[in-house]
Amino acid sequence: MLTVKKGSKSFYVGDSESAPQAEMIFSADKDIITIEHTLVSDQLRGQGAGRQLLQELAAWVRAENKKIVAVCPFAKKELTKSQEYEDVLYHFPN
């Protein structure tokens, strides 16, 4: 299992937020966290780093009582493929 850290604008794996081996970049609004981009280095690819980043971000979102909007294709796919994240997904009004 990788060690995931929370930075000011991302959850990341590595020694620093400015030079991560993997990262999930987000922007924060009042009640909405938008996942902008996920990047995993070749060194960590295939080890579930992206999923671990998402799990940590979702746990933080739950603790903060916020919701997630995903712009990032990876995060969007992971968030909607099971019910695991249903409680943190923001549903746009019709």
Identify the residue ranges that each predicted region occupies:
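A generic "binding-loop/recognition-motif" signal
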Residues: 31, 40, 74-75
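N-terminal first-folded block
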Residues: 1-33, 37
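C-terminal structural segments of small proteins and small subunits
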Residues: 60-94
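A short, internal acetyl-CoA/4′-phosphopantetheine-binding micro-motif in the GNAT/acyltransferase core
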Residues: 38-45
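Short leucine-rich amphipathic alpha-helices used at interfaces
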Residues: 31-32, 53, 81
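Conserved acetyl-CoA-binding loop-helix of GNAT-fold acetyltransferases
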Residues: 46-57
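Short, hydrophobic/aliphatic alpha-helical segments
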Residues: 36, 55-61
